Every structure is written in C-alpha cells, then in structure tokens.
Amino acid sequence: MVSKQPRKQRKARYNAPLHVRQKFMGARLSEALSKEYGTRSAAVIAGDTVKVMRGDYKGTEGKVQAVSLQDGTISVDGVISTKVDGTEVPRPIYPSNVMITKLELKDERRASSIKK
C-alpha cells in the first residue's frame, strides 16, 4: 500500500530511479496535437517544440535542448539567464509548466506509442 503522507510522497519522488523519473516528465499537448493523437499529454524529449505557459518566460516558444531526469527539468531555446560576468546559461523549467506544440517523432517507438 502506498502512503498518503506528503513527506513520504516527496521522499519517493526524490529517491526514484531514472526510469521512474521519466514518467514525471510529462507535459500537456496543444489542442491541435491533442485532437490529432487522441491524448492529452506526452513525455517531453529533446527536439520537441514547447511553449512556456507559466513563469517569467510565459509565452516563449522554443525547442527543447536538454532534458535532465536527475533534476526533473528541461532547457528550452530562448529561456536563458545572464550571469553577473555576462555569460548566458539556460534556465531550467519544469515540464509541467510547458505545452508541447510540435512533437519530435524520429524515434519510431515513441511515434507508435503516441499514435495508439
């Protein structure tokens, strides 16, 4: 039986192995994609085009450059922070705060699982 206690839920997420953390990387699909594929969400992978829906970068659209399962975040083109020394670094975003507008379907396995 799984506990309802928030501390144990947090601990389970924190200590989850990477193959389980992959399931936490889901994001909503745009209306057009949702109708086309008959599903509301999909896991975010590098190459997908996403639109930021929450936060300081709301409305920004760009390609996903990197996915970090360890941190549970993604890096998106155009979402950058400038450090004090002037260098630009990608600003990590949680996948729950983005909407997928274009899917990367080069992987046949992913394409078949989404088209089901």
Swiss-Prot record:
GO BP terms in the entry: translation
Record has Zinc-finger as a keyword: no
Pfam family, any one: KOW
A Gene Ontology cellular-component term: large ribosomal subunit
Entry's Gene Ontology molecular function annotations: rRNA binding; structural constituent of ribosome
Keywords, alphabetical: Ribonucleoprotein, Ribosomal protein, RNA-binding, rRNA-binding
InterPro entries: KOW (IPR005824), Rib_uL2_dom2 (IPR014722), Ribosomal_uL24_CS (IPR005825), Ribosomal_uL24_euk/arc (IPR005756), Ribosomal_uL24_KOW (IPR041988), Translation_prot_SH3-like_sf (IPR008991)
PANTHER family found in the cross-reference section: 60S RIBOSOMAL PROTEIN L26 FAMILY MEMBER
Family under the similarity heading: Belongs to the universal ribosomal protein uL24 family.
Function: One of two assembly initiator proteins, it binds directly to the 5'-end of the 23S rRNA, where it nucleates assembly of the 50S subunit. Located at the polypeptide exit tunnel on the outside of the subunit.
NCBIfam families: rplX_A_E
Subunit composition and interactions: Part of the 50S ribosomal subunit.
Protein name: Large ribosomal subunit protein uL24
Organism: Methanosarcina barkeri (strain Fusaro / DSM 804)
